[in-house]
Amino acid sequence: MTGPPRLSSDLDALLRRVAGHDQAAFAEFYDHTKSRVYGLVMRVLRDTGYSEETTQEIYLEVWRNASEFDSAKGSALAWLLTMAHRRAVDRVRCEQAGNQREVRYGAANVDPASDVVADLAIAGDERRRVTECLKALTDTQRQCIELAYYGGLTYVEVSRRLAANLSTIKSRMRDALRSLRNCLDVS
């Protein structure tokens, strides 16, 4: 197959070939789905490192369990995105459990100079500041930032998604980041 799959049936066929351990089919399946999977995982985890690691785990699971895909129950993309969402949510739960353990065990050794409430308030304030600064951007700048940083897309993918020249996207991103830096008073 050449070019992106036109129908979900193209991905279904690729996934069936992956079930037979066809490496070329796996590479093609990965190429056609990686942005969607990474974007979904990034929206759930909001951490680049964890998102990359989780995405890698998802594709390892695809390689091992492609034979479990049943096209009668849904499309290959739906199967993959469901798997990705579940894996990302599991990662969040695992991290939360780890954080709760750290809180329980660390409570006895609290540094009196540390103020958890103040730290949380500062983090919330920073989030609000970023949100306000994003609102100050033009619609096109905000759209570029959201696709690249929250959607996990590369500049090339953003330019394709918005049907704009790559140089235009780079200019919008540069201007948007400069505006955000100025708005947030970051040097």
From Swiss-Prot:
**Which Pfam family, an example, fits this chain?**
Sigma70_r4
Q: Which GO terms describe its molecular function?
A: DNA binding; sigma factor activity
Transcription among keywords = yes
- Provide the GO biological process annotations: DNA-templated transcription initiation; regulation of DNA-templated transcription
Q: Which CDD domains match?
A: Sigma70_r4 (cd06171)
Positions of the DNA-binding region? 155-174
Q: List the disulfide bonds.
A: none
Provide the alphabetized UniProt keywords.
Answer: DNA-binding, Sigma factor, Transcription, Transcription regulation
Question: Where is the motif named Interaction with polymerase core subunit RpoC mapped on this chain?
Answer: 53-56
Which InterPro entries did the record assign? RNA_pol_sigma-70-like (IPR039425), RNA_pol_sigma-70_dom (IPR014284), RNA_pol_sigma70_r2 (IPR007627), RNA_pol_sigma70_r4 (IPR007630), RNA_pol_sigma_r2 (IPR013325), RNA_pol_sigma_r3/r4-like (IPR013324), WH-like_DNA-bd_sf (IPR036388)
- Keyword Transcription (UniProt): yes
Q: How is this protein induced?
A: Autoregulated.
Per the record, its GO cellular-component terms are: peptidoglycan-based cell wall; plasma membrane
What residue spans carry the region label Sigma-70 factor domain-2? 30-96
The segment annotated Sigma-70 factor domain-4 runs over 133-182
Copy the domain comment.
Answer: The sigma-70 factor domain-2 mediates sequence-specific interaction with the -10 element in promoter DNA, and plays an important role in melting the double-stranded DNA and the formation of the transcription bubble. The sigma-70 factor domain-2 mediates interaction with the RNA polymerase subunits RpoB and RpoC.
Q: What further fact does the record state?
A: Extracytoplasmic function (ECF) sigma factors are held in an inactive form by an anti-sigma factor until released by regulated intramembrane proteolysis (RIP). RIP occurs when an extracytoplasmic signal triggers a concerted proteolytic cascade to transmit information and elicit cellular responses. The membrane-spanning anti-sigma factor is first cut extracytoplasmically (site-1 protease, S1P), then within the membrane itself (site-2 protease, S2P, Rip1), while cytoplasmic proteases finish degrading the regulatory protein, liberating SigK.
Q: Please report which protein family the annotation says this sequence is part of.
A: Belongs to the sigma-70 factor family. ECF subfamily.
Subunit info?
Interacts transiently with the RNA polymerase catalytic core formed by RpoA, RpoB, RpoC and RpoZ (2 alpha, 1 beta, 1 beta' and 1 omega subunit) to form the RNA polymerase holoenzyme that can initiate transcription. Interacts (via sigma-70 factor domain 4) with anti-sigma-K factor RskA.
Q: Its biological function?
A: Sigma factors are initiation factors that promote the attachment of RNA polymerase to specific initiation sites and are then released. Extracytoplasmic function (ECF) sigma factors are held in an inactive form by an anti-sigma factor until released by regulated intramembrane proteolysis. Sigma-K controls genes such as mpt70 and mpt83.
Q: What is this protein called?
A: ECF RNA polymerase sigma factor SigK
